[in-house]
Regions:
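C-terminal region of N-terminal signal peptides and the immediate post-cleavage residues
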Residues: 21-32
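Short, conserved micro-motifs enriched in small and acidic residues
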Residues: 56-60, 104-112
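Acidic/histidine metal-binding catalytic segments
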Residues: 85, 126-138
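An active-site-proximal "capping" alpha-helix that borders the catalytic cofactor pocket
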Residues: 109-124
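Acidic/His-rich, divalent-metal-binding segments that scaffold phosphate/diphosphate chemistry
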Residues: 31-99
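Divalent metal-dependent phosphate-bond-processing catalytic cores, especially two-metal-ion Mg2+/Mn2+ enzymes
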Residues: 15-19, 53-59, 63, 67-82, ...
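His-Asp-centered metal-binding catalytic motifs of divalent-metal-dependent phosphohydrolases/nucleases
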Residues: 85-103, 114, 138-145
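N-terminal secretory signal peptides and thylakoid transit peptides that target proteins
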Residues: 1-17
Length: 250
């Protein structure tokens, strides 16, 4: 993309990480538990879904996003099970790009398609409380820059949303500053869950979906903007064109 993306918003259990089936070598000198994941029954079923549905590079992105989210929160003194629900952050991070899978590919833009799939997945597993709303909101918003930085958003919305979106943003473009993650932590994460093409590979899926179904890339959305930048010859309504077509004659 030609314009810079905000690094902050660009879009705890035992060692389940060892069973994560993500491709990579064991991380050297990792602190016990720092590369672990929640091991609740819901976390395990979510991991199974992601393992089956997401390509390895996308699955690794999802797993790294959680690890970065938890580590960045820890750098701020925010502790799991005390200041936030780690399972809920895990659900958001693992499911946030399900709209880029075959299973989640609908007529909706990928963020909303993924949010809908995540909500249905939780409901099908008997989860019908506020967690469904929190997961849906976080996934649907995860490419909307700066929203979770609003002081009112941070005060009124669940902490898990901002924590998860911070981790996703870190994995997309890197930490905002050297102190956002513990020293050497990113290297240990990447040793176990390598990037495998990283976010450029993710972008290729987004573009392919948009080319196959332009309804998934409406103008002035992230998918629409990326499609326009990659394929400028394709029709792309500007804001003035949309206004010119309005039925009120303004």
């Amino acid at each position: 993309m030609s314009h810079p993306i905000s690094r902050r918003a660009a879009i705890g259990g035992a060692a389940a990480g060892a069973a994560a089936v993500a491709i990579g070598a064991p991380a050297a000198d990792a602190t016990p538990g720092e590369l672990s994941f929640p091991t609740t029954w819901l976390a395990r079923r979510t991991h199974t879904l992601v393992t089956r549905a997401q390509q390895p590079f996308l699955r690794n992105h999802s797993l790294r996003s959680f690890l970065f989210a938890r580590a960045a929160a820890g750098q701020q003194g925010r502790r799991p099970n005390e200041h936030y629900d780690p399972e809920l952050v895990y659900l958001i991070c693992l499911l946030h790009d399900m709209g880029l899978t075959d299973q989640g590919n609908t007529d909706q833009r990928f963020e909303v398609a993924g949010a809908d799939l995540a909500a249905r997945f939780l409901e099908n597993h008997g989860i019908t409380d506020h967690r469904v709303d929190t997961v849906w909101d976080a996934i649907a918003l995860h490419t909307s820059q700066h929203v979770h930085e609003s002081p009112v958003f941070q005060r009124r919305r669940p902490a898990e949303i901002g924590i998860a979106l911070t981790g996703i943003g870190i994995d997309l473009t890197g930490p905002d500053d050297p102190g956002q993650l513990p020293p050497g932590f990113a290297d240990r994460v990447h040793a176990r869950y390598p990037r495998l093409g990283g976010c450029r590979a993710l972008t290729e899926i987004m573009v392919a979906q948009s080319l196959a179904n332009p309804r998934k890339a409406p103008p002035m959305t992230l998918p629409g903007e990326i499609l326009h930048q990659r394929h400028p010859a394709l029709p792309y309504p500007t804001w003035d064109m949309i206004l010119d077509a309005n039925t009120w004659g303004d």
